[in-house]
Amino acid sequence: ILKSGDYIKDKYSCDYLVIGTGAGGSVAGTLLAEKGCDVVFIEEGGYFPTSSFNNKVGDMTAKLYRNRGISPLIGKPLVALAEGRCVGGGTVINGEGLFRTPKRILDEWQQDYGLMGYSYANLEGHFQKVERDLNVESKSISSEKNTNLDSQKLIEGAKKLNWRTEFVPRAAKNCQYTNSCSIGCPTGAKQSTLVSYLPRAIDAGAKIFSDCRVTKIIHSKGTAHYAIAEVIVKNKKHKIKIYFNYLVIAGGAIQTPHLLKKSNMSKNAGKKLEFHMNVKVIARFPESIYADKGTMFPVQIHEFENEDCYINTSAVKPSYLAM
């Protein structure tokens, strides 16, 4: 793993260049590396191992998030977007829920848009493989005293209203219920790509260029040739070139189209962007909920699933909620 200050050359080369180390890029690059391919990952953010994670919200959001936690999307309404920017990407800061694409959505893609080969039957084996790789389970919530009390309250309320609840499939192994999912799991229980796919890729010979921001893809006649990236050398910005035979751009729904547009590779990139809104409701209870003992949304209300609405709890620390 190359970090800021490690870049001693102006030019690098590889067979496969993968831009992004989150949920998309890490899987693609790992599978290629394990097939014997020469793979280089590029990550704009820094490399922060599990041992560096602490319980300080301000410190960890500054390290793991783009713009220290909040990127405002200007429009009506004004939306606060949270993006991961570190080795492991958004998987390091998400809530470890891992959902299969619903069958009704896959059916819609096939029936309304003619997208063949992506039926539930086609994808089920792939879903199962990823779930095995990430130790996914959705059994129950912790029975330990004063743990996940927010989710217990959600279940109690749903029962009174006769609403359907489901346990969330979680990519976690031996969860210690520190409720630090959103600022980096300090125990390594959450199976982010930082602790799951990327170590496999490195073991297979892949390299990771961290603190390395791709600014442009150089291409001609429909073929991409090399990437121009910015790194820090002796406290100054320095440009390097990475040549490749094959390119995977996996910078997420925001950064991927942004890079494609900057590189004049696509006029339509980003025009069909959609994202789900999180609407927060804050509740006060007469008894303690112990936000430090639990994990993010192990249970959801699925009563309104067909209306594209889930309800879950997130007993985050006050300093994180303030964001």
Give a label for each model feature:
Residues I1-Y16, E34-K35, G75:
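Extreme N-terminal leader/targeting segments of oxidoreductases
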